């Protein structure tokens, strides 16, 4: 008996988390640039592979979280319409982010880097990903 199709979602989550942890820019934006092994610190502390928005951010915390939605094409037994939702949140005291003398919104810098990492690339092995929306909720 083979493995269930749902195991692919687990693999996709791991690939996305790996990309976040391997991005020097995201590592820097999460405040882990001086860490020897950010891949051991970021998952489940600064990035959650599920929809997670903390109730109250009491410290100057920053989070890059994500969720996956996928529909199964039962005729071909493959996932189609795979959607990755990123939830980028931070404490209000760190929204303003200064880089090389220029002020940005922290979450705008994160969004740009996520776009650089994932757009028009086949990271998950299911075809190229595309930015569909950049609308906050």
Residue ranges of predicted features:
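Short regulatory "switch" loops immediately downstream of catalytic or recognition motifs
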Residues: 25-29, 90-95
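Oligomerization/assembly interface segments of phage tail-like spikes and tubes
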Residues: 78-93, 114
């Amino acid at each position: 008996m083979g493995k269930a199709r749902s195991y692919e979602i687990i693999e996709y989550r791991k690939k996305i988390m790996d990309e976040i942890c391997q991005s020097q820019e995201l590592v820097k934006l999460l405040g882990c640039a001086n860490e020897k092994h950010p891949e051991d610190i970021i998952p489940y502390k600064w990035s959650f592979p599920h929809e997670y928005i903390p109730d109250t951010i009491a410290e100057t915390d920053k989070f890059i979280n994500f969720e996956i939605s996928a529909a199964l094409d039962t005729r071909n037994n493959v996932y189609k319409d795979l959607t990755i939702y990123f939830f980028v949140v931070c404490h209000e005291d760190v929204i303003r982010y200064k880089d090389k003398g220029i002020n940005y919104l922290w979450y705008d810098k994160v969004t740009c880097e996520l776009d650089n990492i994932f757009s028009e690339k086949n990271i998950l092995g299911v075809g190229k990903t595309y930015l569909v929306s950049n609308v906050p909720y």
